[in-house]
């Protein structure tokens, strides 16, 4: 109930209008909006226009900075059993806070919120929007983009990595960085640190097929011609394995280790063995993605002892002043701690609205010109020949021996 009043209080901080009955009851057994909801971050600013000239076309098309940014937020706020998804409400609350902050900074935002489980049609509300954030699943996005084939509206995929498959054919902006991009970033990183006396060691579990991320890393290593040794064993042999790591390790350089496995217990064992190399007068560094830190039973000290290099889609640096500000404001408004969905809701809305405000109505064509480091995500887009755009932003984390974490 406290969170209910907090959201209503937040809505009083921005101009609010609605064309139909509105219900906002966050929390368990709460109901979401049943019809259109419009939240307006109502701060006026001056506008200006710029011109861009498409290649091969003599007609100049204006990219005008709009007076008001129209955003539709399409979320399944009510599930089919009549309850709600708390994580998606956290995403929604983060987006509301972003709209509030944007309004205070001089960017006027109209935020239309739609419950995709309401059964109501959405096409009329999408008209005139600069972007649609959602739907959540790649399947729902495919249905929506198919409905809007004849329109110029852009869909922003905020959470589902599988929506990357839609980018080649549809007007979709993929904000979660794909595994292939994370793998390329990790191999780029390894390659930049690799010295002649070093050795790359790929460790895998007997009888296991590599997962998607591992396949991408192995493909990148082969593509770049980076040679590597392999070590394959079964987790049941773990007690006999440390000496095999020593045998494969570089004597004078650093052994750079990658675990090509989706098994949590096996990856944990690889981390333990890389950590043990230092007691055998060898130096080892582990390269991985952020899945490793979520494994139950992982000892954080081992991540630091192994001087782990980790690529991450999402990472929150709680020592950052802007994170502290967000957390305190979120606590004050919603009487709870923000989770990763709240950070993502804030980041996605803030980035898209800021891009429109800076790049104008042709923002999607000029997206590579604007990058942003959000609370937990980075947004970097490059020029692409396909229909949509894919975020290339990846955070690189170094677990230092002094138990600090550096972000690159």
Model-flagged regions — what are they?
Residues 11-12:
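Repetitive helical segments and hydrophobic/amphipathic motifs
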Residues 15-17:
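N-terminal signal peptide c-region/cleavage motif recognized by signal peptidases
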């Amino acid at each position: 109930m406290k969170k209910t009043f907090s959201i209503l209080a937040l809505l009083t901080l921005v101009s609010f209008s609605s064309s139909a009955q509105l219900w906002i009851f966050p929390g368990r057994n709460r109901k979401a909006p049943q019809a259109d909801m419009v939240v307006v971050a109502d701060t006026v600013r001056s506008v200006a226009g710029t011109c861009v000239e498409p290649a091969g076309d003599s007609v100049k098309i204006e990219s005008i900075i709009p007076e008001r940014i129209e955003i539709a937020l399409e979320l399944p706020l009510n599930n089919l059993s009549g309850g709600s998804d708390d994580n998606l409400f956290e995403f929604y609350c983060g987006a509301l806070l972003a709209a509030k902050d944007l309004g205070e900074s001089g960017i006027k935002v109209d935020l239309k919120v739609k419950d995709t489980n309401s059964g109501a049609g959405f096409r009329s509300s999408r008209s005139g929007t600069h972007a649609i954030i959602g739907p959540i699943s790649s399947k729902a996005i495919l249905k929506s983009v198919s409905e809007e084939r004849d329109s110029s509206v852009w869909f922003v995929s905020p959470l589902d990595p599988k929506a990357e498959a839609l980018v080649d054919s549809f007007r979709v902006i993929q904000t979660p960085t794909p595994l292939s991009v994370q793998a390329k970033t990790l191999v780029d990183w390894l390659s930049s640190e690799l010295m002649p006396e070093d050795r790359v060691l790929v460790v895998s579990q007997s009888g296991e097929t590599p997962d998607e991320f591992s396949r991408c890393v192995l493909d990148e290593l082969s593509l770049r011609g980076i040679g590597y040794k392999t070590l394959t064993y079964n987790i049941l042999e773990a007690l006999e394995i440390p000496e095999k790591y020593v045998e494969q390790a570089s004597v004078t350089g650093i052994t750079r280790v990658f675990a090509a496995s989706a098994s949590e217990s096996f990856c944990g064992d690889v981390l333990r063995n890389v950590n043990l190399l230092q007691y055998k007068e060898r130096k080892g560094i582990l390269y991985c993605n952020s899945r490793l830190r979520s494994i139950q039973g992982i000892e954080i000290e081992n991540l630091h002892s192994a001087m782990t290099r980790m690529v991450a889609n999402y990472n929150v640096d709680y020592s950052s002043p802007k994170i502290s500000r967000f957390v305190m404001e979120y606590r004050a408004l919603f009487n709870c701690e923000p989770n990763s969905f709240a950070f993502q809701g804030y980041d996605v809305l803030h980035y898209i609205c800021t891009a429109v405000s800076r790049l104008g109505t042709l923002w999607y064509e000029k997206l590579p010109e604007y990058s942003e480091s959000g609370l937990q995500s980075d947004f970097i887009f490059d020029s692409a020949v396909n229909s949509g755009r894919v975020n290339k932003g990846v955070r690189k984390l170094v677990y230092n021996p002094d138990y600090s974490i550096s972000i690159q």
